[in-house]
Design a protein with these regions (language model features):
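N-proximal low-complexity "stem/linker" segments adjacent to membrane-targeting elements
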Residues: 1-47, 51
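C-terminal catalytic/acceptor-binding lobe
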Residues: 3-8, 155-229
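Anion (oxyanion) recognition and catalysis
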Residues: 34-35, 87, 181
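Short, conserved alpha-helix that lines the donor NDP-sugar binding/gating region
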Residues: 49-62, 177-178
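Short, high-confidence coil segments that cap the C-terminus of an alpha-helix
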Residues: 65-66, 91, 185
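Conserved catalytic core of nucleotide-sugar-dependent glycosyltransferases
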Residues: 79-164
Length: 229
């Protein structure tokens, strides 16, 4: 990661990994990443993801000059300027479009049926092809690539991520996004800035002839195939 001259405020790229990094492609993306001058890399290692993110947010709060946090794990690929692009959207909470890395390879946006108490991933073909998508009242999402402003971190802490105990949520990031919604924050998905999610291959949402496909990218960034949705 390197700093670049920018009128945008500095922040922290919060890299959350185990003691051994899973995918080299993710480290290549981090190495190429750019952020406004004054930004820092806040790298936290360990098996407890919730604690690592809490530590990363605490690092942001300890440095008044840092005005945002960008959450990233070691199983994603992304463009070098993704944090800058998300900052330019001027939203309090925003994530890039990201797909599930196992079937169905739909966005990591969760639709909740309050009547039947059921959940499903939102189908990719139902998503717009550009601009920002605002989560609906019965939707949640993952936190991969989330850019969250300092003011939101201040209001939602100091204990940001809860370790799962009751089983009422599927994962800690789901619980955290639900907390943000309850505090009155809107959450946006940037359809023009997207993540790859590394599984058997790197699964990426791509537009082909104006329609969404799931692009499968192998080692060396070699395109394997496009899956229609």
């Amino acid at each position: 990661m390197q700093g670049i001259p920018s009128s945008l405020p500095p922040g922290a790229v919060c890299m959350i990994t185990g003691e051994i990094v899973r995918y080299a492609q993710s480290m290549q993306a981090l190495h190429a990443m750019v952020a406004p001058n004054g930004s820092v890399l806040s790298w936290h290692m360990g098996m407890l993801v919730a604690r690592s993110i809490n530590d990363a947010f605490a690092t942001v709060m300890s440095k008044p000059e840092l005005q945002w946090a960008f959450i990233m794990g070691d199983d994603h690929t992304y463009s070098p300027n993704i944090a800058v692009n998300l900052l330019k959207r001027e939203k309090e909470v925003i994530i890039p479009l990201c797909l599930n890395r196992v079937p169905p390879m739909d966005p990591t946006i969760i639709e909740i049926d309050p009547v039947h108490h059921s959940r499903r991933l939102k189908p990719l073909e139902e998503m717009p092809t550009s601009g920002l998508y605002k989560l609906g009242p019965n939707e949640s999402c993952g936190d991969a690539g989330m850019l969250i402003r300092r003011s939101v971190i201040e209001k939602s802490g100091p204990k940001w991520y809860e370790r799962m105990k009751s089983g009422s949520h599927q994962a800690e990031d789901d619980e955290f996004v639900t907390k943000l919604r309850m505090l009155g924050y809107d959450v946006y998905v940037d359809m023009d800035n997207r993540l790859g999610h590394i599984g058997a291959v790197d699964f990426r949402p791509e537009l082909v002839d104006g329609k969404w496909v799931v692009r499968c990218v192998g080692a060396g960034y070699r395109r394997v195939c496009d899956l229609k949705v």
